[in-house]
């Protein structure tokens, strides 16, 4: 039985993994997939623990995602958020849907009752049946914050604000000097995460944000080391096509850490395992085929294929390309 581990953020990682599961259902139904999900976007809001990436992956794989926006539930209403706002509470820039609130309430109750985030996630997945094992990167609370380079509304230059505020409220338009993972120093991988990496036949870094999604997962002590030492082949899929982020504002994140917005630069940022990085192989889009020589020179086997996940067919084809590249790149 083939075992595959995916290190995923939100929308891009969720959609890729769905395509992977659909492809495997048709070609290798006995394959087992584990998804290690970024929890750096997590936060407390109005007494509830919000886990944006875990929920996006769970809803997407479980058939409950709002396909148009890529997050949240379809046919959602926001009456409760409106009532919270009427009390002068909550954040005007971050509203919680009424259906989505049920997930947050159940999760928060489980956490307050002594469950770990892993246990709460397992419980929530019993309803959604995502077809893969979902693991948070850590049960330790880790929250990504952005340090502002300039004043913004009530915030002053140098202040740290939660990543979701920078991402959702400011649409990554306010320059930042760094990203800080609060709580990272005491974090450990969640149970099963290291084993999922060490015992996999293939590890995939999907087209998620390389800085604050996959990058945050890799920053958890022990995970990068497990990737470097696993006997599995590690294949990445570029989140950059023709010099632009596929979704969101990943270019602003890359700029903050001094990495160019290109498939080549992100591949080199991850680095080859032979050179101390985490990649054996890297998929880039056909429009970025010119990057292949530089990537090969750095020890990263790369192939140019269509990367746009426009529908289930193209996403399944991309997943098949990742599997094929992994098979060709294995030791």
Feature map (PLM): residue ranges:
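Extreme N-terminal starter segment of soluble prokaryotic enzymes
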Residues: 1-5, 31
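A short helix->loop->beta-strand "cap" motif at the edges of active sites that frequently abuts
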Residues: 29-31, 230-234, 279, 300
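Redox- and metal-dependent alpha/beta enzyme cores, enriched for Fe-S-associated oxidoreductases
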Residues: 218-260
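Short Gly/Thr/Asp-enriched flexible loops that form oxyanion-binding sites at enzyme active sites
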Residues: 17-21, 213-227, 292-296
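A short, Lys/Arg-enriched amphipathic alpha-helix followed by its capping loop at the start of a domain
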Residues: 15-32
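Electropositive, gly/pro-rich neighborhoods at or near active sites that engage anionic ligands
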Residues: 25-27, 37-181
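Active-site glycine-rich loop that binds ribose-phosphate moieties when present
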Residues: 177-197
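C-terminal functional extensions of proteins
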Residues: 247-331
């Amino acid at each position: 039985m083939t075992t595959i581990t995916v290190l995923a953020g939100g929308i891009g990682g969720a959609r890729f993994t769905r395509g992977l599961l659909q492809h495997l259902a048709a070609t290798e139904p006995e394959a087992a997939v584990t998804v290690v999900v970024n929890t750096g976007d997590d936060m407390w809001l109005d007494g509830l623990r919000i886990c944006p990436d875990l929920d996006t992956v769970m809803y997407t794989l479980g058939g409950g995602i709002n396909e148009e926006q890529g997050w949240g539930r379809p046919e959602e209403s926001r009456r409760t958020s409106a009532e919270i706002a009427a009390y002068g509470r909550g954040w005007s820039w971050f509203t919680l849907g009424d259906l989505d609130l049920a997930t947050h309430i159940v999760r928060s109750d489980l956490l307050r009752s002594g469950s770990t985030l892993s246990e709460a996630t397992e419980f929530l997945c019993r309803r959604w049946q995502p077809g893969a094992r979902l693991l948070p990167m850590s049960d330790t609370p880790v929250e990504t914050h952005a340090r502002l380079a300039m004043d913004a509304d009530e915030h002053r230059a140098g202040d740290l604000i939660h990543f979701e505020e920078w991402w959702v409220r400011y649409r990554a338009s306010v320059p930042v000097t760094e990203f800080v993972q609060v709580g990272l120093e005491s974090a450990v991988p969640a149970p099963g995460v290291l084993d999922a990496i060490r015992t996999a036949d293939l590890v995939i870094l999907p087209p998620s944000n390389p800085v604050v999604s996959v990058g945050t997962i890799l920053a958890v002590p022990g995970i990068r080391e497990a990737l470097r030492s696993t006997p599995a082949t590690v294949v990445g899929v570029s989140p950059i096509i023709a010099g632009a982020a596929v979704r969101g504002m990943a270019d602003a994140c890359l700029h903050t850490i001094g990495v160019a917005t290109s498939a080549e630069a992100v591949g080199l940022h991850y680095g080859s395992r032979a050179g101390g990085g985490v990649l054996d192989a890297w998929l880039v889009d056909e429009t970025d085929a010119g990057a292949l020589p530089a990537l090969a020179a750095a020890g990263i086997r790369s192939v140019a294929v269509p990367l746009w996940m426009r529908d289930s067919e193209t996403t399944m084809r991309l997943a098949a390309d990742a599997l094929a590249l992994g098979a060709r790149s294995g030791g």
